[in-house]
Amino acid sequence: MLQEDRDELTMNQKKSPMLFRLIKWTVRTCYHKVSLQGSEHLPDTPCVVVANHCQLHGPITSELYFPAPRVTWCAGQMMELKEVPGYAFQDFWSQKPKRSHWYYKLCSYAMAPLASYIFTHADTIAVRHDARILSTFKKTVAALQEGNNVIIFPEHDVKYNHIIYEFQDRFVNVAKHYYRKSGKALPFVPMYIAPKLKTAVIGEPIYFDPERPMDEERERICNELKNSITALGEALPLHTVVPYRNIPKKLYPKNRPNQEVSL
């Protein structure tokens, strides 16, 4: 089956396969329950929710506990069996000590069948950083027009502050395509996920302004989202932040620097 066909199936299927439902039930049973705060900030209209990735915790939280209809952007490589090992090692484990790389490369191959199955059958939209991104935008606009919210984890390797990493900013272009189709300004909603507190917090929406140049809007929206997510994180009780990168746990930062942390 072609990737685009799989994407359509993922977004339109009425009932997930039994195996996927069993996997999801198992994860829900084993994973801690997440308390969601700030859901009153979700607009009455569909929106794009932008959150910190916090490794696997972000996707798990969005899949199990987001309180409204949603689909989630997913790296297209994680939906292709042959591409999972290389992408998984680079994205999850490449910063581990070099002496252990052989082990994590084995893990990358071992996880490939299950990972590609899960991400293909979850409510996801594949993201590719090439010409296929236009297909991603098209499917995203369609999902929004069907009444779904869209969850995006746009962080990449460059650190922004102690809470969050810099964003790959092209996701903001969804707002331009959505405005052309609907005539509506798309809201972007910040969300901070704190696995150590078993909590996720939703902040106030930031609206796309179609009258401003796109380059300026990308920068403005990304900066406001990053700062809002940071403020949401800092306002919570003192805790250890689970960063985007899978670095040694002893290097995990605190939500308020220079304070003692108990969680």
Name what the model sees in each region.
Residues 1-31, 259-262:
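N-terminal membrane-anchoring alpha-helices
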Residues 2-7, 129-263:
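Non-catalytic C-terminal accessory region of glycerolipid acyltransferases
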Residues 22-46:
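A short, well-structured juxtamembrane/interface segment
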Residues 27, 57, 61, 173-174:
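Short amphipathic alpha-helical face segments that pack within enzyme cores
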Residues 35, 55, 111, 133-137, ...:
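Amphipathic coiled-coil/heptad-repeat helices and related helical stalk/stem segments
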Residues 44-129:
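Catalytic core of membrane glycerolipid acyltransferases/transacylases, capturing the structured
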